[in-house]
């Protein structure tokens, strides 16, 4: 789904299409009407059968619903409170906070690396001591 | 007006026209065109027949010779709603004109009014675009910050757990010391007649003590 601004612009364009289609379709399907006090003596022109639907009502509903949708989308737009200065200061504050959290993350990673080195050194000492004990035991057995 | 005078195309050329300028041979012979310099502070430049000013990102309605229907200081949402309602009223007026007097010049005036309303609405909505871009950037930075904080917290938790495991392993070591003492006792009883090996009896205990000292130093 698109963002709200794009939805709103699409709805406005759709409303314009509804305007054009309403006038075009109603004009196309309209019936000829008789002039007052101007009737022919001869046989009347046969009137075509009326259309099944009421296009005027249909387009009226479409246009009204579209206008209501536009109002709803306009209501969802942000207020003027979040102005450019507020946004810029918020962006700068976020940048500073991001740099701070990046430094914190680096410090934690460095602590982890130090602990890893200590553990590796401890394991190395343990292995060395075990090797020394094995050598000593061999000497004792001999 | 400017389009009719200068006949500027409204779209860029297809990419092949630009790619052909940057073949390896052209680059080697220094024939490839360089990127244009950035415009100066108040320079007005033309892009596809439309004049752009560097100060304002979106051209105002006055500079486009379009009548402005909204005041200078306004509430955008209220003005947009007014324009929306004006659209409906103007459309109803247009229908009345079509019913009563289809050939009057006021019909075309009404159509122009409706077009003007649509242009103003779209302009107001497009003025929200820079705000939207900044808001999107702010949301991205918020997500980045939250990710970093969560990653640091998770790493710290793992670090504490590793320290606990190491301390637990270290606190379990005295049991080995007791076992070693009993083992030493066994060795003493076995090699008691041979006095020449008395010096060798100290070696395993000495090695074990050295290992413990190194471990304590490393952890602390």
Swiss-Prot record, chain A:
Chief subcellular location: nucleus
- Quote one Gene Ontology molecular function term: transcription coregulator activity
**Would the keyword Transcription regulation turn up in this protein's UniProt record?**
yes
Residues in a coiled coil are: 87-111
Keywords from the UniProt entry? Activator, Coiled coil, Nucleus, Transcription, Transcription regulation
Against SUPFAM superfamilies, the record matches this protein to:
Mediator hinge subcomplex-like (SSF140718)
> Its GO biological process terms?
positive regulation of DNA-templated transcription; regulation of transcription by RNA polymerase II
Pfam families assigned to the protein according to its UniProt record, in alphabetical order: Med21 (PF11221)
Domain of life of the source: Eukaryota
Q: Which GO terms describe its cellular component?
A: mediator complex; nucleus
Tell me where it resides: Nucleus
Q: What does this protein do?
A: Component of the Mediator complex, a coactivator involved in the regulated transcription of nearly all RNA polymerase II-dependent genes. Mediator functions as a bridge to convey information from gene-specific regulatory proteins to the basal RNA polymerase II transcription machinery. Mediator is recruited to promoters by direct interactions with regulatory proteins and serves as a scaffold for the assembly of a functional preinitiation complex with RNA polymerase II and the general transcription factors. Required for activated transcription of the MtnA, MtnB and MtnD genes.
Give the quaternary structure.
Answer: Component of the Mediator complex, which includes at least MED4, MED6, MED14, MED17, MED18, MED20, MED21, MED23, MED24, MED27, MED30 and MED31. Also interacts with MED7 and MED10.
Question: Under which name does UniProt file this protein?
Answer: Mediator of RNA polymerase II transcription subunit 21
- Tell me the organism: Drosophila melanogaster (Fruit fly)
From Swiss-Prot, chain B:
- Subcellular localization, as worded in the UniProt entry: Nucleus
Asked if Transcription is a keyword of the record, the answer is yes
- Its protein name is Mediator of RNA polymerase II transcription subunit 7
What keywords are annotated for this sequence in UniProt?
Answer: Activator, Nucleus, Transcription, Transcription regulation
Q: Which cysteines are joined by disulfide bonds?
A: none
- Name of the gene: MED7
Q: What InterPro entries does the annotation carry?
A: Med7/Med21-like, Mediatior_Med7, Mediatior_Med7_sf
Q: List the PANTHER family hit by this protein, alphabetically.
A: MEDIATOR OF RNA POLYMERASE II TRANSCRIPTION SUBUNIT 7
What function does the entry list? Component of the Mediator complex, a coactivator involved in the regulated transcription of nearly all RNA polymerase II-dependent genes. Mediator functions as a bridge to convey information from gene-specific regulatory proteins to the basal RNA polymerase II transcription machinery. Mediator is recruited to promoters by direct interactions with regulatory proteins and serves as a scaffold for the assembly of a functional preinitiation complex with RNA polymerase II and the general transcription factors. Required for activated transcription of the MtnA, MtnB and MtnD genes.
Assembly and interaction partners:
Component of the Mediator complex. Interacts with MED21.
What Gene Ontology terms describe where this protein resides (cellular component)?
core mediator complex; mediator complex
* Gene Ontology molecular functions: transcription coregulator activity
| The organism's taxonomic lineage, starting at the top | Eukaryota, Metazoa, Ecdysozoa, Arthropoda, Hexapoda
């Amino acid at each position: 789904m698109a963002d709200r601004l794009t939805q709103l612009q699409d709805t406005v364009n759709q409303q314009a299409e509804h305007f054009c289609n309403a006038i075009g379709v109603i004009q196309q399907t309209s019936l000829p009407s008789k002039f007052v006090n101007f009737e022919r003596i001869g046989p009347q022109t046969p009137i075509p059968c009326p259309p099944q639907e009421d296009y005027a009502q249909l387009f009226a509903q479409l246009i009204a619903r579209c206008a209501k949708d536009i109002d709803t989308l306009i209501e969802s737009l942000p207020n003027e409170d979040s102005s450019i200065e507020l946004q810029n200061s918020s962006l700068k504050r976020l940048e500073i906070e991001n740099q701070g959290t990046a430094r914190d993350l680096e410090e934690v990673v460095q602590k982890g690396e130090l602990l890893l080195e200590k553990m590796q050194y401890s394991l190395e000492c343990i292995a060395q001591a075990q090797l020394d004990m094995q050598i000593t035991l061999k000497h004792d057995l001999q | 007006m400017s389009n009719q005078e200068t006949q500027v195309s409204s779209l860029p050329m297809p990419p092949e026209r630009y790619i052909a300028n940057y073949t390896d041979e052209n680059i080697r012979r220094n024939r490839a065109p360089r990127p244009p310099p950035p415009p100066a502070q108040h320079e007005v430049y033309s892009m596809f027949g439309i004049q752009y000013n560097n100060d304002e990102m979106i051209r105002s309605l006055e500079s486009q010779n379009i009548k402005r229907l909204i005041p200078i200081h306004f509430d955008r949402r209220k003005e947009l709603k007014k324009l929306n309602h004006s659209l409906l009223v103007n459309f109803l007026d247009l229908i009345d004109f079509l019913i009563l007097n289809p050939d009057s010049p006021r019909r075309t005036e009404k159509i122009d009014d409706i077009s003007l309303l649509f242009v103003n609405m779209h302009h107001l909505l497009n003025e929200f675009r820079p705000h939207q871009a900044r808001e999107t950037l702010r949301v991205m930075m918020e997500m980045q910050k939250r990710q970093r904080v969560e990653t640091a917290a998770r790493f710290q938790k793992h670090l504490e757990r590793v320290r606990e495991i190491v301390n637990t392993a270290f606190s379990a070591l005295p049991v080995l010391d007791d076992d070693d003492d009993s083992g030493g006792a066994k060795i003493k009883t076995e090699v008691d007649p041979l006095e020449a090996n008395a010096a060798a009896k100290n070696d395993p205990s000495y090695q074990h003590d050295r290992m413990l000292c190194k471990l304590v130093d490393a952890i602390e």
